[in-house]
Amino acid sequence: MVDFLEIGRVNKKGYTEIYPKFVLKRRSEDLMIRGGDFYAIWLEDRGLWSTDEMDLTYLVDQELSRVSQEIRDKGNVVKTLYMWDAESGMIDQWHKFCQRQCRDNFHMLDEKLIFSNQELKKTDYASKCLNYPLEEGNTPGWDKLMSVLYSPAERHKIEWAIGSIITGDSKDLQKFMVLYGPPGSGKSTVLNIIQQLFDGYYSVFDAKALGNPSN
């Protein structure tokens, strides 16, 4: 169970009521708060962090269901206040806990690439991973394509840029790469391959808007 959650119990006439009890920690290892609101939760079964609040709701409700069943197995009646049930008020209690009672406690996620053959740790702060391993191999298709589209010198620049992303050096390099040329010269082809290489780790922006002084 995550370190910021306990299951509260109240004995009432004829039944037991259970509810999620959110616990303040000096520094939670399973929950991140950023800007006074939920940022991420650690999902042990996936070995990843998640910024999807519905994953948190599911995890809490799963724990409530487990405790509820334990009580029923002892022959007792139980009323469970689930997070998914808006009328229970538990989701409101959760938002109050995050926004009013917790201090910011977070580490930026996905600051480095994670490959499918990499053993993940919580302190890798990853919410995603690439669907292929990082390992040595031959690239005949890439070699053939690049030999047609680019000179050896230009190909070297592109592969150097890709390599800097893989090693993480690109975060400190004050450089960027621009592909230019007439239609059909392979710009989109190379960009599409790079996007596939770093699926989930790239974003798209409007270069014209970026250079507009009014923005």
List the predicted regions and their residue ranges.
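P-loop NTPase catalytic core of nucleic-acid-dependent motor ATPases
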Residues: 28-54, 58, 106-215
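Intein modules and their embedded homing endonuclease domains
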Residues: 1-125, 129
